[in-house]
Swiss-Prot record:
Descriptive protein name: Uncharacterized protein L385
Compositional bias (Basic and acidic residues): 1-17
Region annotation Disordered: where it falls in the sequence: 1-24
Keywords: Coiled coil
């Protein structure tokens, strides 16, 4: 209710408050009720504005939290991706080293087998020479 309306109502109210007519009294009472209702509506509007402002502030705070968590998530995701890349390259290096060690082991195994074969052949020759020496002690080569 604006100022001019309240001035008009109060003048009107004064004019009829002096009257003793029951209709005038009920009209005055009705005007008081209307003023009370206007006050209540004004109060509700004020409270509604306060509630809306509080809600807007809460939404802003929640948006700030969400933005903060999104940034932290992005940072963590980048960190995790970096760690995964580092670990993948370490795994690749280890796989290469394992493959190299397997190849070296295979070469060593083949070399040992060849050496055992050569040793067996040489021991065979030595035993043949010793056998010859036992059977022919005077026949030295």
């Amino acid at each position: 209710m604006n100022k001019s309306e309240s001035e008009n109502d109060s003048e009107y109210h004064k004019e009829y408050s002096e009257s003793s007519d029951p209709e005038d009294t009920s009209f005055i009472s009705l005007n008081k009720e209307i003023q009370n209702i206007r006050y209540i509506i004004s109060d509700i509007k004020s409270q509604t504005v306060d509630v809306i402002q509080n809600l807007n502030n809460n939404v802003k705070e929640y948006n700030a939290f969400i933005h903060k968590f999104q940034n932290e998530y992005k940072t963590d995701k980048i960190s995790v991706n970096s760690s995964v890349c580092h670990l993948e390259s370490r795994v690749h290096i280890l796989e290469h080293e394992i493959k190299s060690i397997k190849q070296d082991n295979q070469m060593l195994f083949e070399k040992m087998r060849d050496m055992l074969t050569d040793n067996s052949r040489l021991f065979g020759i030595i035993f043949d020479i010793l056998k010859d020496l036992e059977t022919n002690p005077g026949n030295k080569k």
